[in-house]
């Protein structure tokens, strides 16, 4: 009888963590393990690359609204979730003001923390041998999944993010193991949460071979200006990635007489901020 594994993540938009997840899914031996994948939203450019031998579970409406505007949550009559998210936003603002943080990482953590009580159980009739929470926040796998062992993944360098350490410690503690993608990530994480050292394991990212091969074969339509230096940055538009400073950096490079164009590809909550910074700086960043 096959061991049953559940992996929980957000969506499959372009990003390093999502690509790493594809690498794991490609390399799991499905002759030995039966793998269920629960995505809160069936969205993203990488969704089509999920291997066919992986069982993609149906969406659950309550989970799909977590990343959508609160007005949409109200329209879909998820009133308790809307109230919980409003409360989470309020608590995040209070925390940031108290700590004098300009923009911390607590907003999304609080969003999951205060909505979890209203979320339905994922696969209520199944007890898994192992459940993996692949992206933070990690509340739902601990409280909404039945499994003999539970693992939370960490992709973030904690030396560059501002978090509510007391709240997050309570989030991480219930897990049997915490999988870090690198020694540096482990080091920064343990500086913040030294008491979790015994739970740490190292599992480096696995490149998704199929995805890379398919993308390498695709024709690139964009024609670049050969008379300038073209730079390209790809990633999630979030505070730790520092994309919002790229327009100013690009402007400074131009002021030094270097002919450059800087292209940004990605998605995320900082997109509006980045576009504003581009308008303020120079259209050579796009």
Segments from the language model and where they lie:
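Glycosyltransferase donor-sugar binding loop
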Residues: 39-44, 234, 261-273
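Short donor-sugar binding/catalytic loops of nucleotide-sugar-dependent glycosyltransferases
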Residues: 11-12, 234-238, 253, 268
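N-terminal strand-loop element at the rim of the active site
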Residues: 13-14, 32-103, 200
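Donor nucleotide-sugar binding/catalytic pocket of nucleotide-sugar-dependent glycosyltransferases
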Residues: 151-155, 159, 173-215
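Nucleotide-sugar donor-binding and catalytic loop/hinge architecture
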Residues: 1-3, 214-230, 254-256
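A structural motif in glycosyltransferase catalytic domains
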Residues: 21-24, 28, 231, 246-249, ...
